[in-house]
Amino acid sequence: MPSVLIVDDEANVRRMVGALLSAEGYDVRDAGDGASGAARAEEAEPDLVLLDLMIPGALDGMAVLERLRRKFPDLPVIMMSGRAGLADAVKATRLGAVNFLEKPLTPEGVLLAMASALELRIARRERTALRADLGLAGQLVGESPAMDDLRAMIAQIGRAHV
């Protein structure tokens, strides 16, 4: 089952969401501030992060989001907040958040957002793999040293028979 990191300064949120996700079979880890959340994400490389926007400390939610997006471009991050407005949701989305949940959270809302985010991650990974396959195929067929040698030999034969 996918692994999830919950980063929130409210122990109740971490406990309740963690219990919900554990019951659904997710491997759940948590952190209570931005710095430890970023560190846990970097060491554990979760499949998804639920991140509170307004966490205290040197790294707030937006700073953690930016850091995670730089290090793990395909990692889906869902932002959560009880006090943020539309401007914060737009900013988080521009920085790469895949969803923005308002507190108080509902089990249905969390599970739906997570399912969508995990599907997006799978699609991104498949796209990356397909692009790599296409690049390799182009390289093998059209740009390989063997093809360059073959083209040179054909050109040489063509000049010899003219």
Predicted regions: what is each one?
Residues 131-161:
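AAA+ ATPase active-site-proximal loops
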Residues 85-87, 101, 105-114:
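C-terminal output helix
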Residues 11-29:
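Two-component/phosphorelay signaling modules centered on CheY-like receiver
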Residues 44-50, 55:
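Active-site beta3 strand of CheY-like receiver
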Residues 25-35, 39-40:
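Short hydrophobic/Thr-rich beta-strand motif most characteristic of the beta2 strand and flanking loop
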Residues 8, 52-53, 81:
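Active-site residues of response regulator receiver
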Residues 39, 54, 59-74, 91:
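Short amphipathic alpha-helix used as the core "switch/output" element in two-component signaling
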